[in-house]
A protein has these predicted regions:
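Sec/Tat-exported extracytoplasmic proteins
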Residues: 172, 208, 212, 216, ...
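N-terminal membrane-targeting segments
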Residues: 1-92
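Catalytic-core regions of hydrolytic enzymes
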Residues: 198-274
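Catalytic cores of processing enzymes, dominated by hydrolases/peptidases
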Residues: 237, 245-264, 269-347
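Active-site-adjacent mobile loop/cap segments within catalytic or ligand-binding domains
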Residues: 323-384
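Second-shell loop/turn segments in exported
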Residues: 189-201, 208, 230-239, 291-299, ...
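Long, well-ordered alpha-helical scaffolding segments within enzyme catalytic domains
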Residues: 203-206, 299-319, 356-380
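Non-catalytic propeptide/linker segments at domain boundaries
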Residues: 78-173, 177-187
Length: 386
């Protein structure tokens, strides 16, 4: 069978790429260059096995190699990878040029997996835990405003018997995270701190727990006052994930539980223009998902977050700010998500959101989550994994 005269062009770019890589390896060995492991891992992750297979298949069978198809191995792609490996600089990401030169810039190195409406490098979430002594400075709750908001946000719950099988664990690592409208004389984001369950994220956990129970889902809701616990242990607020990790482990070891899903509820420090979305005439507190990359279950957790984001956006367009992936250089990196392949950290709202907006978003999340939960449970039973 006569081979096409044009066949060499399909291999030329691949051969050039190999030559460049060999030259790069030789240069690294000769000059004893040090490559950032994070950059190397990200570069390798950009190569997908299915793309490699398709590339080699198309090279042998031109029927699978239409002219409009982009080549996987091109001089451009190879040169970009070479530059990234040799210098730890990604030409398309300005943060990598100054990441090692400007103190604190690495805190904004969060990877955007799915960008929700308005999400870009300028609106990335970042972590900042206040000192324990600041957390202990209790602020007064705006009692009258809280009662009024709770009255407007009241929801008739159907009284049902809690399911015996507990499969969902809800907790709040930063339980002190509160909201300015619920506190007296609170003006700036750093003021949004409270240990009163009515005014902090524990209240959101209670709402979510009750919603899920009414959907027939068994829930264990931890209401630990993390400020008090950290203070009693003589630990700084930066150790909050270690403390909540112990709570998670205790819950898992309880033989009365059959925990699969783990939801850590947080509140973002961004202001209202970023954390609020009007949907069908009502304001919702926007939410987003954070996935820790420093453990071997992160890909499965990432799939869960992406699926929930997609479902939320389908029903409530604009409610999700997206899905973010973090390593230890940008935060904790694990967030206790190594306990399960169905673990998630959900940031609900920001410092300026009130209970009406927050409760609407909690209700929206639990509606979507419960549908996903039951569909996943049915799929397990069909496949014999239940």
């Amino acid at each position: 069978m006569k081979r096409s005269a044009n066949q060499p062009k399909y291999f030329s770019s691949f051969i050039v790429a190999l030559i460049i890589m060999y030259l790069l390896i030789g240069t690294i060995i000769f000059m004893n260059l040090k490559i950032d492991s994070v950059v190397l891992q990200k570069s390798i992750n950009n190569l997908y096995s299915k793309d490699l297979f398709a590339h080699f298949l198309r090279a042998e069978n031109h029927y699978f190699y239409p002219k409009e198809t982009d080549e996987l191995f091109t001089i451009s792609n190879a040169s970009k990878m070479a530059i990234q490996l040799a210098t730890s600089v990604k030409p398309s990401d300005a943060r990598t040029f100054l990441g090692n030169e400007l103190p604190g810039l690495r805190l904004y190195d969060t990877e955007i997996i799915i960008a929700g409406e308005g999400t870009d490098l300028t609106t990335l979430p970042y972590e900042s835990s206040p000192p324990t002594e600041v957390l202990l400075e209790e602020r007064k709750v705006a009692e009258e405003k809280l009662k009024q908001i709770e009255g407007n946000s009241s929801k008739e719950f159907t009284q049902v018997s809690p399911p015996q099988k507990k499969t969902v664990y809800i907790y709040q690592t930063h339980s002190w995270e509160s909201f300015l409208p619920l506190l007296e004389d609170a003006q700036v984001p750093n003021d949004a701190i409270s240990n009163d369950e009515r005014a902090n994220v524990i209240g959101l956990g209670k709402r979510m727990s009750q919603n899920l129970i009414n959907k027939g889902i068994g829930v264990v809701h931890d209401t630990t006052n993390m400020t008090k616990t950290l203070n009693e242990k003589g630990m700084r607020s930066t150790k909050a994930y270690a403390v909540s990790g112990n709570l998670v482990e205790d819950a898992v070891s309880n033989k009365g539980n059959d925990l699969t899903y783990f939801i850590d509820i947080h509140r973002d420090s961004a202001r209202k223009h970023l954390t609020t979305k009007n949907i069908n005439g009502k304001d919702y507190a926007r939410l987003y998902f954070v996935v820790g990359k420093e453990h071997n279950k992160y890909l499965e957790n990432l799939d869960t977050a992406k699926e929930l984001h997609k479902r939320l956006e389908a029903k409530y367009p604009g409610i999700s700010r997206g899905v973010f992936l973090k390593t230890k250089s940008e935060g904790n990196g694990v967030y206790n998500q190594d306990v399960s392949n169905k673990a998630m950290l959900v940031e609900i709202g920001g410092v300026d959101n009130d209970l009406n907006e927050l409760y609407r978003s909690v209700d929206a999340f639990t509606e979507v989550f419960s549908e996903y939960y039951w569909e996943s449970s049915e799929a397990k039973e069909v496949n014999g994994n239940g």
